[in-house]
């Protein structure tokens, strides 16, 4: 089988293209990355890419391929017209624009990082507001300081019409459940906006350097670890109305949640911070995207967590993206018309306040 880096997945047998079978309701791709060159220019030379697990734990073959991918996809990552053409070919009415993962800059130890984050949010907002019929935007946050991050949330939501924020699942040595981030979760709840969790490799990735394992295994593993901490460290308990939206189908935990419930029932050290419910009950409050590639895995997520908690996404424009998200949903057996409309756009419209 030939390699198709930016086309249909070999993870399933495809049916009719989604553009031909799409529902009449609004379709939304809720996981799409946009590169902000102005921010990259600001931090140039201020950090070592080897501080980022996705780069540090990659062999030379992977590194070379990733460099080529950025060259191949630079127009998709930066050019609105290129993006709109792709959306039209997929049958996507609206994209949720999200920063590229390595532009979180949590490892930049400088005031310049705050300026870079502000620049990213301003440019994302500008891009979305210039085409309100096709885009909304999620921002990013200066996670070096939880108080400054909370203030940036207020600015972005109140002044820029930002609809939520992407946060990387591990923050330069700190878990997302760290007390210094409590204000972020409280502010997200107050503003009634979702937080999108996205990985960027796995920090303990020595065994994952070959075969792109740092992404294939490492990304869902890092997400899995982050969700465990948010649940067991009490973040979800303390913030019952917090809306968490998770990339790549939520990593490994949604498919193996009975293990955390078993541990919670069997061991006192798994009781966490006064958890009032089974760990999986907190997981069921979260939302998961559809980037799992196979029909059976998507059907499992829908059956286990409800169609109202599954949100269509692609991870555009990378080679690990889902190229035909509508076909993926439409080809999943046993879904009702209402479920299809929720997953392909309705849930995203509710989460991100899209009219």
Indicate residue ranges for each PLM-predicted region.
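Short glycine-enriched loops at secondary-structure junctions
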Residues: 143, 199-203, 316-318
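Active-site gating loops and adjacent loop-to-helix segments of metal-dependent hydrolytic enzymes
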Residues: 24, 33-77, 203-221, 260-283
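Mid-to-C-terminal alpha-helical segments outside catalytic/metal-binding sites
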Residues: 1-26, 30, 37-94, 122-130, ...
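Active-site loop-helix segments enriched in His/Asp/Glu that coordinate
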Residues: 102-129, 147-155, 175-186
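Short glycine-enriched, charge-decorated loop/helix-capping segments at active-site entrances
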Residues: 110-114, 214, 327-330
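Catalytic pocket-lining loop regions of alpha/beta-barrel enzymes
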Residues: 3-10, 128, 132-134, 154-311
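Short acidic/His/Gly/Ser-rich catalytic and metal-binding motifs that mark active-site loops
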Residues: 104-106, 149, 203-210, 320-322
């Amino acid at each position: 089988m030939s390699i198709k880096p930016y086309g249909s997945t070999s993870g399933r047998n495809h049916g009719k293209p989604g553009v031909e079978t799409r529902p009449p309701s609004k379709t939304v791709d809720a996981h799409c990355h946009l590169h902000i060159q102005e921010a990259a220019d600001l931090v140039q030379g201020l950090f070592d890419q080897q501080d980022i697990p996705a780069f540090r734990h990659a062999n030379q073959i992977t590194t070379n391929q990733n460099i080529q991918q950025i060259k191949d996809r630079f127009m998709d990552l930066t050019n609105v017209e290129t993006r709109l053409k792709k959306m039209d070919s997929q049958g996507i009415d609206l994209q949720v624009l999200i920063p590229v993962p390595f532009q979180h800059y949590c490892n930049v130890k400088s005031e310049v990082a705050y300026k870079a984050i502000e620049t990213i949010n301003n440019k994302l907002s500008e891009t979305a507001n210039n085409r309100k019929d096709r885009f909304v935007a999620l921002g990013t946050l200066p996670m070096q300081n939880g108080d400054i991050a909370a203030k940036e949330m207020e600015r972005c939501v109140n002044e820029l019409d930002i609809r939520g924020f992407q946060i990387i699942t591990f923050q330069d040595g700190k878990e997302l459940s760290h007390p210094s981030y409590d204000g972020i979760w409280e502010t997200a709840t107050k503003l009634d906006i979702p937080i999108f969790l996205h990985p960027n490799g796995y920090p303990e990735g020595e065994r994952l350097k070959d075969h792109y394992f740092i992404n294939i295994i490492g990304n869902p593993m890092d997400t899995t670890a982050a969700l465990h901490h948010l649940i067991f460290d009490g973040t979800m308990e303390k913030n019952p109305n917090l809306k968490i939206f998770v990339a790549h189908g939520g990593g490994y935990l949604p498919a193996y949640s009975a293990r955390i419930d078993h541990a919670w029932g069997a061991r006192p050290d798994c009781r966490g911070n006064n958890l009032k419910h089974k760990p999986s009950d907190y997981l069921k409050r979260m939302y998961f995207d559809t980037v799992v590639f196979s029909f059976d895995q998507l059907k499992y997520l829908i059956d286990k967590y409800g169609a109202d908690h599954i949100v269509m996404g692609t991870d555009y424009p990378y080679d690990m993206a889902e190229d035909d998200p509508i076909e993926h949903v439409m080809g999943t057996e046993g879904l009702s018309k209402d479920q299809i409309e929720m997953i392909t756009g309705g849930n995203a419209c509710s989460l991100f306040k899209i009219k």
